Each structure stands twice: as C-alpha cells, then as structure tokens.
Amino acid sequence: MAKLIVALDYTYASEALAMANILKKHVEWVKVGLELFTHEGPSIIQLLKRMGFKVMLDLKLFDIPNTVKGSVRSACLMDVDMLTLHILGGEHMIKAALNEVQSSIQKKSHSPLLFGVTILTSIKQGELPGYNQDIASMVLNLAAYGQQWGLHGIVCSGQELTKIKALYPSLSCLTPGIRMSYSQKDDQHRVMTPSEAVKAGSDFLVIGRPITQAEQPIKIVEDIISSIM
C-alpha cells in the first residue's frame, strides 16, 4: 500500500508541531521542507522524531559532490528517514550522496532513503528556457539516470508515473502535487488525486495544504487513506 506523507509546510516550529500533534495517531510520515528547516534547523527533525514520526527532509540538494556528501552525512546524524536531491546534479553528485549513505550503514548509523527530484510539479511546459524536450520526456530521461545511478527512488508528478513504472517497476516513486478532486491546485500544475496516483503506481504520496489547511485535517487523512486502500 502507498504511504501518505503529510507536508508540514510552515515557517515556525510551533505551527508544524501543532499540526503534527493533531495527526500523530493517524500518520506515519511527515515532510520538512526548505522553509521550515531553514528557520528552525535540525531541532525540528529531533522534535518530530521524538513524536514517533518518520521524517522526509525535502531540501532538494543540488551542489558540488563534496558539499552534498557532507549534507547527507549531517542528515544521517539527524536520523532523517528520507532525503531529496536533484538528479540534474549529475552522476558524481548522486554517487557521492549514495556513498555517504553506504558509509552510514557500515557504521551502523541511521541511513535515509535518497529520492531524486526530476522536474518540479509546479513547472509547466515552456517554463524551462534552453530545454527543447517536453516535460514528460525530461522526467523519463532523469528517471532512467536515477535508476542507473542507484537511487532508492525518484520524485515525479502523477502524470509520468505509468510510463516510469512500466520501464522501471522496482524504482520507488514519490508523488507530490496530490490534490483531492474538490480542492484547489494552488501553485501546482501537474496534479492528480490520491486514488489516481496510486492506480498509476505511486509508492509515496506527498500532500500538504489539502490536509493542513482543512477545518478537519483528520477527516481528510481518513478520506485519503480510504481512497488508496
């Protein structure tokens, strides 16, 4: 069964922890993104882990190999369960990150799953100057590299899932841009409902505002889980 990851897209720890406290008996995974992590630092990870959550640290790392390697080492020390990085960072960057995870395993330390970002779900066709390929083709090419280089999984929109799973059935796929049929798209463009994404082959669904901005977030979580079972 696909896993639900609730995106705690807040600025302050107080807001994120308040929502986490509401959801802690109903959700296994939460996501900490760039805004919250930049404001609160590693302490927010520690607090969420103490509450019993598995934590996806969504920093979308994209830097020189040595810098990314050091960032992955820090994530391992924070007991992060999943970490994102851009596949466009290239083979040397990806393999430096994977080597650091392997080193953590050998030291019997905590080691996160590494998921490679393909193309952000907020990007529409024509918004990438200098790239002549259509978005779907770019995502498929990046997924191929992610598989080849040994990533644990990739991040892609629901619209590319079916083709990716047909080509790489063992590659885990994490899908952001998930919206309920009745909810707004917000700043997402390539979106899909939870049941559609699971039918297409998604292994992890990242959902934020449709849950965290709802009057009854637990009810929305229950509806989502029911729709993907």
Curated annotation (Swiss-Prot):
Keywords from the UniProt entry: Decarboxylase, Lyase, Pyrimidine biosynthesis
tRNA processing is among the record's keywords: no
GO biological process, one term: 'de novo' pyrimidine nucleobase biosynthetic process
EC number: 4.1.1.23
Record SUPFAM superfamilies: Ribulose-phoshate binding barrel
Gene Ontology cellular-component terms listed: cytosol
Residues that, per the record, bind substrate: 9, 31, 58-67, 121, 179, 188, 208-209
Catalytic activity: orotidine 5'-phosphate + H(+) = UMP + CO2
Key word Lyase present: yes
Entry's Gene Ontology molecular function annotations: orotidine-5'-phosphate decarboxylase activity
Pathway assigned to this chain's UniProt record: Pyrimidine metabolism; UMP biosynthesis via de novo pathway; UMP from orotate: step 2/2
Enzyme active site: K60
Domain of life, source organism: Bacteria
PANTHER family named among the record's database cross-references: OROTIDINE 5'-PHOSPHATE DECARBOXYLASE
Summary of the function given for this chain in its UniProt record: Catalyzes the decarboxylation of orotidine 5'-monophosphate (OMP) to uridine 5'-monophosphate (UMP).
Subunit structure comment from the entry: Homodimer.
Family: Belongs to the OMP decarboxylase family. Type 1 subfamily.
Identification of the protein by name: Orotidine 5'-phosphate decarboxylase
